[in-house]
Swiss-Prot record:
Keywords: Electron transport, Membrane, Mitochondrion, Mitochondrion inner membrane, NAD, Respiratory chain, Translocase, Transmembrane, Transmembrane helix, Transport, Ubiquinone. It is found in: Mitochondrion inner membrane. Core subunit of the mitochondrial membrane respiratory chain NADH dehydrogenase (Complex I) which catalyzes electron transfer from NADH through the respiratory chain, using ubiquinone as an electron acceptor. Part of the enzyme membrane arm which is embedded in the lipid bilayer and involved in proton translocation. It comes from Avahi unicolor. This is NADH-ubiquinone oxidoreductase chain 4L. The keyword Transmembrane helix applies. One of its GO terms (cellular component) is mitochondrial inner membrane. Core subunit of respiratory chain NADH dehydrogenase (Complex I) which is composed of 45 different subunits. The lineage of its organism: Eukaryota, Metazoa, Chordata, Craniata, Vertebrata.
Amino acid sequence: MPPIFANIILAFATAFLGTLIFRSHLMSSLLCLEGMMLSMFILSTLIILNMHLTVSFMMPILLLVFAACEAAIGLALLVMVSNTYGLDYIKNLNLLQC
């Protein structure tokens, strides 16, 4: 395994660990999810280029489209929660609260 793949997998693992540790704040979770998506994009691009898979050249672009949609929905949710409650705690997203 080349060192670049190990570094990207380490970046993904770090972002995933950050998601598990900082799961109480919505902004921290969104940043960690973006880090995971970025490392997945770079890893998929490198794998496709190294294996010369001409059929799958569109997959990293599709991953970026989904990452942009996830970021837009996450930021809209963050603005909604911040305006409603004044905080960005994930526990405020519980729909069963009275």
